[in-house]
């Protein structure tokens, strides 16, 4: 097994536990950087000419019909407590017939003991798309075919997410910042993986140029995971300070900008939308919009900006912690349905053709 995956598994477990606790209780949202979705206003249709009861929220992703254009994004796994979280997320995904991504499966490759925390997902969500997940540093180091098979078989995965987390690794106390050779290894991975590969940022966004490189390496779906939601730099900075104290790694003048580093979600969608429009070979690529999604109106705006589905992690984690996961998803779908009614859209295909205008926001 490669050097990266030989890291003691108890360190990985501690990190994953820290991540959930910090995301639930810490102040780790972007400051001064928003998703950019608030800049848009969806045009009202005073004469909708439809029956609200006839509105259909169903969508497609990778050829699969799903109940709505929403995905429960990758969060956690690989330790005992994660089994309960993942089971509940999977039950919600099955209830609403929406896709689900698991957290990084590196731990499943390091230690057989905690594989059940991932396996529970497919048991609880037998009929919806479920996606495996591994990090870019692990891909750059080289994954064996047997390791890929282990991840996919464990959850009977419909796709493999490769998460791109350079900014997170930079701030992580035990981070791996060696991304050299990643694109070549990604091309090798996509060639030998029997399911589609999804490239996903974790909160700093994917530009059109990065999307082009990823697509050319064989990626079929881009999850932009733009800035405006959870800053994983802030999550890791909390862990760093707890371990080493308030030791200065970066100049005070730069630290705030680095903690809030990233491309807003809306900007990512705009850029990749232009890439697809101007280059026919990229048009089949599907887009997942995540990074700061807070409501069904945000979901609607991402659909109008070219996404196939929107996805959320942090907001839904908090909803689960509050015992309101199903209620929150239900409200978001009601939000989306309201927008569709007020734009005269019976389907998502019709919604995609509606207009948005840029608001004049105060400076």
Curated annotation (Swiss-Prot):
Q: Which EC class, in a word?
A: isomerase
Molecular-function annotations in GO: FMN binding; isopentenyl-diphosphate delta-isomerase activity; magnesium ion binding; NADPH binding; oxidoreductase activity
Record: residues binding FMN? 73-76, 104, 133, 200, 230, 313-314
Q: Which first-to-last residue range defines the signal peptide?
A: none
List the GO biological process terms.
isoprenoid biosynthetic process
The enzyme's E.C. designation? 5.3.3.2
- Keywords for this entry? Cytoplasm, Flavoprotein, FMN, Isomerase, Isoprene biosynthesis, Magnesium, Metal-binding, NADP
Q: Which PANTHER family match?
A: ISOPENTENYL-DIPHOSPHATE DELTA-ISOMERASE (PTHR43665:SF1)
State the similarity comment: Belongs to the IPP isomerase type 2 family.
The name on file for this protein is Isopentenyl-diphosphate delta-isomerase
